[in-house]
Amino acid sequence: NERHLDDIEQGMIRTPGAFDEPRIHIALVCASIGCPMLRNDAYTAERLEAQLEDGMRRFFSDRTRNRYDASSGTLRVSKLFDWYAKDFESGHAGFASLAATFAKYADRLADTPEAQARIRSGDYRLEFLDYDWMLNDAR
């Protein structure tokens, strides 16, 4: 019985009731420039919670993929949050909405306390960045 990676992600992992974990989008990456960076270590059951949380914090800290422009009040985030919005609005793993997700990681999305406060209060215009499908070279 053959399976491809999309079957595993969409048909097994994202199936409602299977794992109900929105942070999976930080772990399952296609190695394109638009994806979160690959980890240097393997995911393990013992460390999975910490690894997923670390992945979210690292992804939101990456200004090429997510950023807040204080001058325009615009939060520009990865297209992943557009494509998988419902996963972050499901209430699973403490994620009830995109706004709540961004508020949780405001300290990673913005550099100043004022900008972080605006994100936490939802006082921003949201834009999704274009997704870069080019292969992410090894660094």
Where are these regions (language model features)?
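C-terminal region detector
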Residues: N1-R139
